[in-house]
Amino acid sequence: MSNAREIRSKVQSVKNTQKITGAMELVAASKMRGAIVKMNNVRPYVESANTIIKNVTAASIDYPNPYLFDRDVKRVGYIVTSTDRGLCGGLNINLFKHVLKEIKNNIEDRVGVDVCVIGSKAENFFAKLKDVNIVATAHYNDKDKEGSIRAIGGAVKVMLDKFTAGEIDRLYMSSNQFVSTIKQRPRLQTLLPIQDIFSAEEIKANKEKATKGHWDYIYERDIEEVLNALCIRYIEAQVRGAILENAACEQAARMMAMKNATDNASDIIDQLKLDYNKVRQAMITQELAEICSGAAAV
């Protein structure tokens, strides 16, 4: 058993660490509130983009836009979002396990895989995989929002260009879904082709609404030009919404991780204090025994 001085040193060390984790918990909580506001602000835009693309594609199905229609799958692409920093529990590793399972299934089916990674954690993880080709990387920095959005937009455009050129036949988005402050879960959603995003029932219902005159669109320019631009905006909206939601997940996961670390530090301190009291009691008992032995000898 350690002596009393060593135990006191350990207690002080754990207390110092506890102060750091407690401060990080408060910082993460503050950042999480801001991230949730941004996430909620962008959701109406993403939902509107969903509705518009669903309605327009149902009414404009005659135009052979490469983003709309299914084709034989020989190669797929993934846009994987992660964090640039750690200390956020199992947020990143759970996401990587989820998407890696899908990637392995594709490789077993002899389907090639291209990956666009957002965040240094995903970049470091997928760089170690031999059968995965990283074609673009980007990072989201909350301090440089405009620069980050431009960088991410450029990385996403690489994947869109590859899809248009027929170099990939499916495009997926892998990110974390914000369920609550204490729960985040990995999510894999189809971005392209757009036809695969909606169920057969949704497509049929939208076609019926369009033919019955429930709604219609008047195009000021050529429908092909409008549809091309709309498809790109739709993908950008999905990616931006996923990135902001992933940022909220990161701060929530970090807050909970730091809270758990702070609570665990309290448990360790309690155990160390108990050990210290046992050592101190043993020392006192030994001293009393020595005094009694000396008195008896006299």
From Swiss-Prot:
It comes from Francisella tularensis subsp. novicida (strain U112). The keyword Manganese does not apply. It is a peripheral membrane protein. The gene is atpG. Disulfide bonds: none annotated. One of its GO terms (biological process) is proton motive force-driven plasma membrane ATP synthesis. SUPFAM superfamilies: ATP synthase (F1-ATPase), gamma subunit (SSF52943). This is ATP synthase gamma chain. One of its GO terms (molecular function) is ATP binding. Pfam families: ATP-synt. F-type ATPases have 2 components, CF(1) - the catalytic core - and CF(0) - the membrane proton channel. CF(1) has five subunits: alpha(3), beta(3), gamma(1), delta(1), epsilon(1). CF(0) has three main subunits: a, b and c.
